[in-house]
Regions:
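Small-residue-enriched alpha-helical segments and adjacent helix-cap loops
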Residues: 23-27, 51-204, 212, 357-358
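A generic structural motif
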Residues: 87-94, 228-232, 236
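Iron-sulfur cluster-binding cysteine motifs and their immediate structural context
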Residues: 208-231, 237-260
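A hydrophobic, small-residue-rich beta->alpha segment in the mid-to-C-terminal subdomain
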Residues: 266-309
């Protein structure tokens, strides 16, 4: 057998980063219990316990903040911590007596504890204006404004019927989980890109630009005697792929870009099958820096859900029970033609779940 050697191919095996109690009881866990907001214990068949303290953190972190988290992990949990897929930081403790001192230190640093169980978890989001060239709205700004209003649902000061997941993506390329979250905030472009014909031949390869369009809306054309392109607006879905390969095809517009709200997505197989999010509010104008219209719309949906849903019902299950007409009535939104999903390839027969229908 060949001798094992160290390479730089792939990440190191995750096992070397697991706390000893998890290694000893891997695959042998009996149950878990939420002790208080943001604190959970997993109990193994052997009686071993691992305590989790979940704290909120921004998606974009400074190195100094990460070092603070590492210092806290060294102090209270032998260096063991992890980040969740929704940007929470979780500290993994073997000693229950260190939970409260850790929470106290986190509070002094300004990081609240919560988000476990029937609570609102951190909002997973995309890059936004800080980095992405095709964003129809900002990510960090909108998420900060929304979480400032919904903060009591994270800490447990206000109750929810079940867990709630909110996601944000700055455009429909969707590098956030907006397709499968209870509430999704999605930046939308509403106009086809503007073509700068004078600059396009100097900056872009036309065959590559034509090939970049997933719907075939871009065609080669001659404009004022020089090679360029044309866009068939009926086929354009405002994805911005063309802008990615050619800066002369500009998708962003301060006047027509905005935000849409989607509801009813879920990943879990519990009770009903996983669901895709569905459109609730087609368009809200961008209004930085605090986006009051967007914040108000999301808060209204959360409060309406909290008031009307049954215990353990996710938003998708609540809407299935009361029906979409009643849902729109409760949130005060008019049903319009823009809510109709006319995408012909979205067949109901496509398998989206491990659940089987007999």
């Amino acid at each position: 057998m060949a001798e094992e050697r160290i390479t730089d191919i792939g990440p190191p095996h995750y096992e070397q980063f697991l706390p000893p109690v998890i290694k000893e009881n891997y695959g042998k866990w009996d149950h878990h219990e939420i002790l208080k907001p943001g604190v959970m214990v997993h109990v193994a068949e052997s009686g071993g316990k691992i305590f989790t303290v979940r704290a909120a953190s921004p998606r974009l972190l400074a190195v100094t903040t990460i070092r603070k988290f590492c210092d806290l992990a060294d102090t209270y949990c032998n260096g063991y911590l992890r980040f969740t897929s929704r940007n929470n930081v979780e500290f993994l403790l073997a000693d229950e007596s260190k939970i409260d001192p850790l929470i106290k230190d986190l509070a002094e640093y300004g990081f609240p504890v919560g988000g476990l169980g029937a609570k609102l978890s951190n909002i997973v989001h995309t890059q936004g204006w800080v980095h992405c060239h095709s964003a129809a709205s900002d990510a960090s700004g909108v998420v900060k404004a929304v979480m400032d209003e919904l903060f009591p649902y994270f800490t447990g000061e206000k109750d929810l019927p079940a867990k709630m997941r909110i996601a944000y993506a700055c455009c429909l390329n969707m590098c956030g989980a907006v397709h499968c979250s209870d509430i999704a905030i999605l930046g939308v472009h509403t106009r086809a890109p503007v073509i700068e014909h004078d600059d396009l031949p100097k900056m872009c390869e036309i065959p590559t630009l034509v090939a970049s369009c997933p719907t075939g809306a871009i065609r080669p054309a001659t404009v004022d005697g020089q090679q360029s392109i044309e866009i068939v607006e009926e086929q354009c879905m405002y994805c911005g792929n063309c802008y990615t390969v050619c800066p002369a095809v500009k998708i962003n517009s301060a006047d027509t870009d905005g935000i849409s709200i989607w509801v009813g997505g879920k990943v879990s197989n519990s009770r009903i099958a996983p669901q895709f999010s569905k459109l609730a509010i087609p368009f809200i104008p961008n209004n930085p820096p605090r986006w009051p219209e967007t914040v108000g719309a999301v808060k209204n949906i959360v409060e309406t859900y909290a008031e009307n849903a049954r215990k353990h019902e996710r938003i998708a299950e609540w809407i299935d029970r009361i029906g979409w007409p009643k849902f729109f009535e409760l949130i005060g939104q008019e049903f319009t033609k823009y809510h109709i999903d006319d995408f012909k390839h979205a067949g109901e027969t496509y398998t989206r779940t491990a659940q089987l229908r007999h």
